[in-house]
Amino acid sequence: MKFERMDCGSVHNGPLAEGCKHCVEGGKMVLFITGRCDTGCYYCPVGLSKKGKDVIYANELCTRNKSEIIDEAESMDATGTGITGGDPLINVERTVNAIRMLKEHFGPEHHIHLYTSTMDMERISAVVEAGLDEIRFHPPLKQWAHMDETPLRDIVMNLSIDVGIEVPALPDHKEELDALVTFAESIGVDFINLNELEFSESNWDMMEKYDYDLVDELSSAVKGSGDVAHYIMKKHTNIPVHYCSSTFKDGVQLRNRLLRKANHSAKEYEVITDEGTEIGRAHV
């Protein structure tokens, strides 16, 4: 399996998940559907303004207005939506309604993927029936080496949409991550996404508690996370693995989304910067 290097240190050893292809191009709106989650991962990077709170964000816009969500997607000419949280399946009715709304407005080609820690087939079936195209499971760390005790095998067997695993590459849990990927490969999971572990305002205490350190003074990435991801990628060549660096998320995905929005909505008198911001054109 060929390794393909991308910008900002990201790399993958096989085809990218369809949802990732849209993200790389800046085409995915991020729909944060709720900050509520029952998993309680110590490394969760969700900001304090969202974590544990029942709030909705369409990209950077805090809203509960359906038309504003559609407007935000239209403003960036979105080709798809990534539904995240918290755990979107905590409020399955809201998530189902959002999927239906987006599909009805933009059509079946609008690609929707969702992140969840929930392995409840009834809730999963509800979002699939609403039009979900891709689901990414985030099992809690305590399950990584014991996935055969979870219902994931049966879930994968009974789903017709793309199924992936997306977790951070924890530098001190290489063996558990290896076990998780081995299990995923054995049951036919379509892809693995490994995110570089990052410090944020809500998980900063893990630096002292788990003896984590920064890659360097200019980065929020945790030292050793990338090394673990590369180890897993080299060992598991029969399943597509994508390592997404912290700098890739900001330097490529976010930048491309901002550029896409600026190009789609800028006025004739505005100039778009390389970072995707809009400034007024000076007249002499």
Positions of the model-derived regions?
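Conserved small/polar residues in nucleotide/adenosyl-binding loops
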Residues: 282-284
